[in-house]
Structures are given as structure tokens and as C-alpha cells.
């Protein structure tokens, strides 16, 4: 029985004073020595019973990859090679999920060690394996092995949307021998990984490497293609044997507050897309400036709100997060909240906008806020915010609204016969097939705004379902 070590090995981070001046990654990740020390804490639960595996949406063999690190302690390259081989069976994007997954709610939340101490830092170990493999060319060697083993079956599948669900589905299908083409509306593939998550959380070079690996598997990626406009859905159905829709939830949810259309008010989607995809923070090197005032209000309490707030802070603003519940009810990851607090983002709880106030030129100058109190839990399990009727005014010259996103109705309206629910989410059966035979969907397009790993889980499930569906055809 391994000796129980209650305290996890901390990961190095850049100092606050250094990191707030640029968009470089905050968490520096484990070295081999630190990763091995953390791996030693794992109790090695039997795979068939391991709670961490059950807590992972893609069911990575977590004890298995950690065991590979421990058993090859004198040979880091061999350790990482075996660990990556195990991870890749279930997760093709470990460098990404190791950074952005809410492990504390999933694998780490289920960890047995967490009942008496800190759970194993599974996410950071996964990231270490992926980073070490990339830096030492190990992933290229393993990928070459996989490519050599692919046997083409002559069938074609189209993927609409190059986000986490689409990329995962494409990778799995390519390994099964399908000819896969991804159609992406934007000029860069990656979806939320590229336009939604800032560099300081997910460096874009990592995403680009994963995309390069996908292309090496034989996947074609067509950008600047808006299905329904550039090419019709019916044309895709005629050309391909099956279709997967992974168009995400890219339409911002905006509440109709008075004054919400004033200059200086952004959706978090637009704000982060300009910064992440169009490199607004590098103006004039990139000609996509974004105007951020001296006092910025970010409305919301999820990861997107934290990303927007921390980005605005790096552009030189004084930033406030305004949230209608308390810190306890925030949906953002604890690590992201902690980083925002460390960096100087200010939090105001139990408030919600009543109206936005403009100056004579139509620019935002203040927000009237209403104080809230907490009532009984709602359907989310969190206590419901209740208006008190008490209001006050705070001066802000920029506001970023981060209260959620919904699926893109523009695309959905171009697909005749596709059934959606009242929220605009695509309706699917237990195999992720839509109301149209041979057309599957997953990720935020069926869930609404969710996590990267849940979208990847859908992509993996859909790939298996597509394979079963096409294998049954004569």
C-alpha cells in the first residue's frame, strides 16, 4: 500500500507583477522531478473501480498513465512515451484538457486521496505528459506509429465546426480510416480554443500543434466556409456518407437592459474574439484595435467572465466583476477566480445591472446597479438571486457582458428538417444522431454552453456512433 501524502506538489507560476504586464501563460507546469513527486501520491486504485476514471467524461485510464510515470522513473522519455500512449487511447488533446478542464469537479473531485487531503493533481500531470512529449518529439514518434496503422475504408465524413467536439470526432474517425473534412466558418480552426480562451490560460501554439497533428492524420480543414451560405447543407449530404455538427454556442446571450446598446459595451464573445483571434492586444502590429476605458465592468461569474476581466486588466484598465450571487455560487474554476483576485480584479457580489447610462455622445459613463439577496435554490442548485429594489450608480466607461451563450440560429435555420429545442439546441438521440438520418451532433450545439472536455466526450461518442451507423450500411 503506497504511503499517503496529503499535500499535493504545487505547480510553479509566474509572479503577479510580471504576468499582468503581458498575455504569457501564468501556470508554468511541472518539471519531471515535480511530476514524479506528485505521481508518487497516487494510491493506484484498480482500473475497474477507480473513481477518477468514472469522473472523467472521456474515461482516461488515469491510474494507468500515472503508473507509467512511476515505473519508469529512471527514464523520463520512456515514462512519458508510455503515459502518452495510454492517454491518447481516450483523449487526443491532453495538452489542452490538462490546462482548461474543470478537473476539480470531475476526475480530481472523485479522487480517493481528496477525502483526506489534496486530490492528485491529475490535470497538471496530464499537461506535463503532453508538454514533455511535444518538447522532446515523442508525440511525433507516436503519431507516426498511428498513421502507419491506419487503413482507409473509402467512406467520407464531413464535420461542421472546428471546435473541441469537431476536432475530437475528426481525429477518431481518421484513425478508423475515414476520409474527414472539417468546415470552419472562421479564418482559423480551433473554435473556442482559439477565439475564447486567452493566451495566459491556453497558448495558441499548443492548439496549432494539435491541429497540425490532425492534418497529419489526413484530416482536411476548410476555413472561411459558412455552411448554409458558402456551401449548402444539402450539397454536403450528397457528397458525404455522414455529417457531424459541432457548431458550438457562439451567439452571446444579452439581456435587454435599458442602454445596453451604448458605445463601450461588448459581449464577452466579441471582446475575447478580438483579443484572442485578432490579436487586438498587439495593435498596431495587428490592425484590430479594441477600445478599453479606464474602468471596466464585467457582468457574470463564469470562466468567460474571468477571462474577459483578466484580459481587460492586462490592457491597463481597473476592472470590476459584478455578480448577482456570492462568490460561493460562481461557476468559474477556483483557480481562475484565485488568479483574478491575485492580479487585482475587484469583485462586487449581490448586484445586477438595472440600466446603462450614457453621455451626450452615446458613450457609456455609468451603470445603475440593483442590490440582490439570495433566496431558495433554483434548478441549477444554487440559491436564486432576488431583487431588493435598492439601487446605486457606479461610474464605468466600458462594460463586458458575460452571462452565457446560445447555439448559432443562423446556421440551424439553413438545415431543413433539423429538430431543435426551445433554447435552440439540436435535439439528438442516445447515439447523438439528429432528426436527420446520418447527421450527428455534439458539444455546445446540443448542450448549450458547457466545457471543452464534455464537447470532446461528445465528439468521441459521435465518432463511434458514425462508425457503427456506416458499418451497418450495405
Swiss-Prot record:
Residue positions annotated to bind [3Fe-4S] cluster are 101, 107, 111
The protein's matches in Gene3D superfamilies, at most eight in alphabetical order, are given as: Alpha-helical ferredoxin (1.10.1060.10), FAD/NAD(P)-binding domain (3.50.50.60), NAD(P)-binding Rossmann-like Domain (3.40.50.720)
Protein name according to UniProt = Sulfide dehydrogenase subunit alpha
User: What is recorded on activity versus pH?
Assistant: Optimum pH is 8.0 (for polysulfide as substrate) and 10.3 (for benzyl viologen as substrate).
EC top class, as a word = oxidoreductase
Q: Which UniProt keywords apply?
A: 3Fe-4S, 4Fe-4S, Cytoplasm, FAD, Flavoprotein, Iron, Iron-sulfur, Metal-binding, NADP, Oxidoreductase
- Co-factor(s): FAD; [3Fe-4S] cluster; [4Fe-4S] cluster
Please describe how the activity of this protein depends on temperature.
Optimum temperature is 80 degrees Celsius. Has a half-life of 12 h at 95 degrees Celsius. Activity increases by 50% after incubation for several hours at 82 degrees Celsius.
Kindly list the GO molecular function terms attached to this UniProt entry.
Answer: 3 iron, 4 sulfur cluster binding; 4 iron, 4 sulfur cluster binding; ferredoxin-NADP+ reductase activity; metal ion binding
Q: What is its main location?
A: cytoplasm
Reaction(s) catalysed (UniProt annotation): n sulfur + hydrogen sulfide + NADP(+) = (n+1) sulfur + NADPH; 2 reduced [2Fe-2S]-[ferredoxin] + NADP(+) + H(+) = 2 oxidized [2Fe-2S]-[ferredoxin] + NADPH
Quote the record's binding site residues for [4Fe-4S] cluster.
42, 45, 52, 56
Q: Which organism is it from?
A: Pyrococcus furiosus (strain ATCC 43587 / DSM 3638 / JCM 8422 / Vc1)
| Propeptide residues per the UniProt entry | 1-2
User: Where does the record say this protein resides?
Assistant: Cytoplasm
Role noted for this protein: A bifunctional enzyme that catalyzes the reduction of elemental sulfur or polysulfide to hydrogen sulfide with NADPH as electron donor. Also functions as a reduced ferredoxin:NADP oxidoreductase with a very high affinity for reduced ferredoxin. Exhibits a broad specificity for various physiological and non-physiological substrates with varied reduction potentials such as methyl viologen, benzyl viologen, FAD, FMN, methylene blue, 2,6-dichlorophenolindophenol (DCIP), cytochrome C and ferricyanide with highest preference for benzyl viologen.
Q: Which gene encodes it?
A: sudA
- What cellular component terms from Gene Ontology apply here? cytoplasm
Q: How does it assemble?
A: Heterodimer of alpha and beta subunits.
> How is its cofactor bound, per UniProt?
Binds 1 FAD per subunit. Binds 1 [3Fe-4S] cluster.
**EC no.?**
1.8.1.19, 1.18.1.2
* InterPro entries tied to this protein: DPD_II, FAD/NAD-bd_sf, FAD/NAD-binding_dom, Helical_ferredxn, SudA-like
Highest taxon in the source lineage? Archaea
Amino acid at each position: 500500500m503506497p504511503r499517503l501524502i496529503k499535500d499535493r506538489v504545487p505547480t510553479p507560476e509566474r509572479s503577479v507583477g510580471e504576468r499582468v504586464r503581458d498575455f504569457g501563460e501564468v501556470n508554468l507546469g511541472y518539471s519531471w522531478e515535480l511530476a514524479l513527486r506528485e505521481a508518487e501520491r497516487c494510491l493506484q486504485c484498480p482500473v475497474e473501480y477507480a473513481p477518477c476514471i468514472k469522473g472523467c467524461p472521456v474515461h482516461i485510464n488515469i491510474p494507468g498513465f500515472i503508473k507509467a510515470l512511476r515505473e519508469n522513473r529512471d527514464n523520463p522519455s520512456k515514462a512519458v512515451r508510455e503515459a502518452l500512449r495510454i492517454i491518447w487511447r481516450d483523449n487526443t488533446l491532453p495538452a489542452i484538457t490538462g490546462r482548461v478542464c474543470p478537473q476539480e469537479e470531475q476526475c480530481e473531485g472523485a479522487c480517493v486521496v481528496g477525502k483526506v487531503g489534496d486530490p492528485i493533481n491529475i490535470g497538471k500531470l496530464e499537461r506535463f505528459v503532453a508538454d514533455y512529449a511535444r518538447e522532446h518529439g515523442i508525440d511525433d514518434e507516436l503519431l507516426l506509429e498511428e498513421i502507419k496503422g491506419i487503413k482507409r475504408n473509402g467512406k467520407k465524413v464531413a464535420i461542421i465546426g472546428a471546435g473541441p467536439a469537431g476536432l475530437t470526432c475528426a481525429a477518431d474517425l481518421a484513425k478508423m480510416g475515414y476520409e474527414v473534412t472539417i468546415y470552419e466558418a472562421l479564418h482559423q480552426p480551433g473554435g473556442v480554443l482559439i477565439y475564447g480562451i486567452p493566451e495566459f490560460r491556453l497558448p495558441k501554439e499548443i492548439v496549432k500543434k494539435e491541429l497540425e497533428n490532425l492534418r497529419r492524420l489526413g484530416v482536411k480543414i476548410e476555413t472561411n466556409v459558412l455552411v448554409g451560405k458558402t456551401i449548402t447543407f444539402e450539397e454536403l449530404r450528397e457528397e458525404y456518407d455522414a455529417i457531424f455538427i459541432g457548431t458550438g454556442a457562439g451567439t452571446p446571450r444579452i439581456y435587454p437592459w435599458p442602454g445596453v446598446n451604448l458605445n463601450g459595451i461588448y459581449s464577452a464573445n466579441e471582446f475575447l474574439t478580438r483579443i484572442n483571434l485578432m490579436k487586438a492586444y498587439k495593435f498596431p502590429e495587428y490592425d484590430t484595435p479594441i477600445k478599453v476605458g479606464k474602468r471596466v465592468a464585467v457582468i457574470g461569474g463564469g470562466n468567460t467572465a474571468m477571462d474577459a476581466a483578466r484580459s481587460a486588466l492586462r490592457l491597463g484598465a481597473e476592472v470590476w466583476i459584478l455578480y448577482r450571487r456570492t462568490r460561493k455560487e460562481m461557476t468559474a474554476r477556483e483557480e481562475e477566480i484565485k488568479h483574478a483576485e491575485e492580479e487585482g480584479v475587484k469583485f462586487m457580489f449581490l448586484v445586477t445591472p438595472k440600466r446603462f447610462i450614457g453621455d451626450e455622445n452615446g458613450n457609456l459613463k455609468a451603470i445603475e446597479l440593483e442590490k440582490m439577496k439570495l433566496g431558495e435554490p433554483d434548478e441549477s442548485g444554487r440559491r436564486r438571486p432576488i431583487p431588493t429594489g435598492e439601487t446605486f450608480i457606479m461610474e464605468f466607461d466600458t462594460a463586458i457582458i458575460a452571462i452565457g451563450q446560445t447555439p448559432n440560429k443562423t446556421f440551424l435555420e439553413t438545415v431543413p428538417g433539423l429538430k431543435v429545442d426551445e433554447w435552440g439546441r439540436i435535439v439528438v438521440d442516445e447515439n447523438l444522431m439528429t432528426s436527420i438520418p446520418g447527421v450527428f451532433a455534439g458539444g455546445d450545439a446540443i448542450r448549450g454552453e458547457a466545457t471543452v472536455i464534455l464537447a470532446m466526450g461528445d465528439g468521441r461518442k459521435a465518432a463511434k456512433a458514425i462508425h457503427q451507423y456506416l458499418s451497418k450500411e450495405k
